[in-house]
Curated annotation (Swiss-Prot):
Matching InterPro entries: Ribosomal_bL36 (IPR000473), Ribosomal_bL36_sp (IPR035977)
Pfam families on file: Ribosomal_L36 (PF00444)
Designated name of the protein: Large ribosomal subunit protein bL36
SUPFAM superfamilies (alphabetical): Ribosomal protein L36
Entry annotated with the keyword Ribonucleoprotein: yes
Length: 37
């Protein structure tokens, strides 16, 4: 899980999800998981 100020989809399978006001990226590739913080 990468914590970044700006989260961007890395590949075509990355999806942007908002949970409780936190922007997350979920993907099949675990390296692409991101969280805004």
């Amino acid at each position: 899980m990468k914590v970044r100020a700006s989260v961007k989809p890395i590949c075509s399978k990355c999806k942007v999800v908002r949970r409780k006001g936190i922007v997350r990226i979920i993907c099949e590739n675990p390296k692409h998981k991101q969280k805004q913080g």
